[in-house]
Amino acid sequence: MYSNLFYHKYSKNIHSQNGEDGVIEELLKRLDISGGWVCEFGAWDGIYLSNTFRLVEQGFNAVFIEGDVTRYNDLLKTVEKHNITPINAYVDHNDTENSLDNLLSKTAIPVDFDVLSIDIDSYDYQVWKGLKVYQPKLVIIEINSSVNTNVEYINDSVKCMGTGFKPTYELGVEKGYTFVLHTGNMIFVRNELFHKLNIRYDNPLENFNTNWGGR
């Protein structure tokens, strides 16, 4: 099945914004993953527009990271009812105490955990690029979908912009991942797992879903 057809067939929102809940559920089903670990930041209360909270409701363990103190307090209310490890920190894209590798090392999450969702509206690209130790099976990363797929645009500020499709795709390849589909976010799977998905496309850089989020 072509990935855009896959998106429109399985797209479903329970907590997510652009159909990721249904898409991720089907991808994990094809990967034979029915439980495990997820990580998401900035998580806010862990529920609102989350790409992974539906999995938490289904029994997955989670590490949710939120830097804003008020929003972190909202997250703590969610933690009381679920298997969530909360972290109050802003993830740094440099090799510091608050790098994603260092923050995750203080938790029980395994190196090859199941789903990573990166959605911080700025240096998402740099955070994933800086992740060296942990190798999640699926990566969901927000991009600037208004940038043409052939433009090499990398956001280098904390403004709510995001990096374009092309450099994010290239980063995934560099890190050993295969691009699966675009929902407004880009979803990647580790190379050795892609064959299980039964998803195809002709040219990844042309596989930008112009109708993402029902647009």
Say what each PLM segment does:
Residues 1-7:
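Juxtamembrane luminal stem/stalk of type II transmembrane Golgi/ER carbohydrate-processing enzymes
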Residues 8-103, 118, 145-148:
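SAM cofactor-binding core of SAM-dependent methyltransferases
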Residues 33, 109-110:
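Helix N-cap/coil-helix junction residues
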Residues 37-40, 54-61, 111-118, 122-215:
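Conserved acidic-Pro-Pro-aromatic motif
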Residues 98-105, 127-132:
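Distinct, well-ordered alpha-helical segments
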